[in-house]
Amino acid sequence: MEMTKNDLKNKLTSPEEAVKLVHDHDRVFIGLVSNITPVLSDALWERRHELNDITIISGLLLRPTRLYTELAENQPFKMLSLFLGPFERTAMKIGRPSAFTSLHLSQVDDWFHNIGKVSVVFISASMPDENGNVSFGVSGGSVYRFLLDTADRIILELNPNMPYVYGQDNIFNINDADAIVMSDKAIPEMAEGEPDEITEKISNQIVPLIPDGATIQLGIGGLSSAIGSKLTDKNDLGIFSEMLCPSMVKLMKNGNVTNKYKGFMDGKSVYAFAAGDKAMYDFMDHNENIYNAYFSFANDPRMIMKNKKMISINTAMAINLYGETAADAIGYHQYSAIGGQLDYVRGAQWSEGGKSIIAMDSSYIKNGKRYSKINFTFPEGTPISTPRSDIEYVATEYGCIDLKHLTMADRVRAMISLAHPDFRDELTEKARHVDLI
């Protein structure tokens, strides 16, 4: 059934009118990553003196919102985040009433259905096609469908800059919205970062572990860029990943990614959320080889394991001598979230020919002093992201070692060998003092 001009006209309203659908005590989802709703969010901020007890739910926003970055006397907004990014951390720093929920991304649908039910969902979407269907864009397919199952009110923020992306139930008809507003904001970008000398050394340790025909999972940052640049001589790679990033798209454009031999969803680059530059977003638009999936699908270890030669590459903030990772918090300071690290660590190892790799610099420098990221023990309060029973390969600029099934003593020795030379003697002495080696 073709959309008529009246279908859109009847739903179209001003942002100021649309946010009048938000009532006291509502829980409002405003977006995640690149799928955020700046027009609706700013309009909601303007109602700060009219409303009471509003919970704003989001995750890893790539654009600031006044709901998080500004405070006002007696303002009603509380933040609930599933994944802390720079703007969520700003909200906590300036004193915005805030809460954080720690969960594996594979559990997001269960959380929204049973615990985190929303009253109102703001949806950032593409322009409608001839049938009145919009796409949830570059990242919305990861969560929007769960929200629609429970939300009382649905408000679309249509944007001609948002790519029309295919995927797992990634389409929504405008007639099912309660209100529609327009936006012309650019889709927020995330720079991948240039690899430095240490990152190049780490990538050199990892690339030999990636064979032709492997299915890869990468994140964003200099390491992904370095690895991606070294995979241009590989053939028939596949993508099944929590995140789609520019280095992956470059491999797709270059013909290194064909998705022919994954053994699961062949022909499709499957991902949950995307963050990159405009060139990447343009490539995603109406690209039938790209598939935006639910978090509960793309991060389900039982789905991940179906991909042959699944190579999962994740990072950590610190690793202890057992090989346990601290990826989202140090001490009592929450920095980000566990995301899908453990989902992919397990799924990759269950895959036929798969491998899980945790990679990081061995040390960092702060105020002119060097500190080890390989720790004897973590600071008090540090949560474990990947436990020692799940860890497999660990890579630093000093090597890459498979820890799986090693004795504790051999594991400790291996981790010390991956540390910066300045700290190896100290780590060895501490390990001997408690009879670890």
Question: Where on the chain are the PLM-derived regions?
Answer:
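Conserved alpha/beta enzyme-core scaffold
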Residues: 1-437
